[in-house]
Regions:
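CheY-like receiver
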Residues: 116-140
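A short, hydrophobic beta-strand element within the central beta-sheet of small alpha/beta folds
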Residues: 55, 82-94
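Conserved acidic segment of CheY-like receiver
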Residues: 1-17
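Active-site residues of response regulator receiver
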Residues: 57-60
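Alpha4 helix (beta4-alpha4-beta5 surface) of REC/receiver domains from two-component response regulators
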Residues: 66, 70, 91-109, 113, ...
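Alpha-helical interaction/dimerization surfaces of two-component signaling modules
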Residues: 15-20, 99
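Acidic, metal-coordinating helix/loop segments flanking the phosphotransfer/catalytic sites
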Residues: 28-54, 118
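Short amphipathic alpha-helix used as the core "switch/output" element in two-component signaling
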Residues: 66-81
Length: 140
């Protein structure tokens, strides 16, 4: 799942995933508020309820009540960390990256028009994130 307010980036991201044969079902949401509501639907009391396996959250989502770091904090606090989750952003601010680690983000991908090499590197590490054995990593 991609949570990002830039519709053009939705297309760039989907194209890169397609080129890499990533077996991800892409659902693009435009705001952290919308994503928070969807997570409430995905994580009911039923543990067998289907939920996203991987979530890419934009750091700065225009028109949202809170940023990507706060969304990750809410998801991990309210729903547990049952999925791979991290930030995708053009920012390389070390303070923001540290905040993301603290709230439970597993990765940080630097956003660009040529996102494919970063996603390819991310996919090599994916099993470690699923098994909670992979270290936090910034993909530049």
């Amino acid at each position: 799942m991609l949570i990002d307010d830039e519709n053009l980036f939705h297309l760039v991201f989907e194209d890169a995933c397609s080129l890499l044969d990533m077996a991800l079902s892409i659902e693009a949401l435009d705001s952290s508020d919308e994503a928070n509501e969807r997570f409430k639907e995905w994580f009911p009391d039923d543990p067998n309820h289907e939920k996203p396996e991987c979530v890419f959250v934009d750091l700065n989502i225009i028109g949202s009540s809170f940023d990507g770091i706060e969304l990750i904090r809410k998801i991990n606090h309210e729903h547990g960390n049952g999925c791979v989750i991290g930030i995708i952003s053009s920012s390389e601010d070390e303070e923001e990256i540290d905040k993301a680690k603290i709230v439970g983000a597993q990765f940080w991908i630097i956003k660009s028009d040529d996102i494919e090499p970063r996603l390819e590197e991310f996919m090599k590490d994916y099993d470690g994130y699923v098994n909670k054995t992979g270290p936090f990593k910034v993909y530049r």
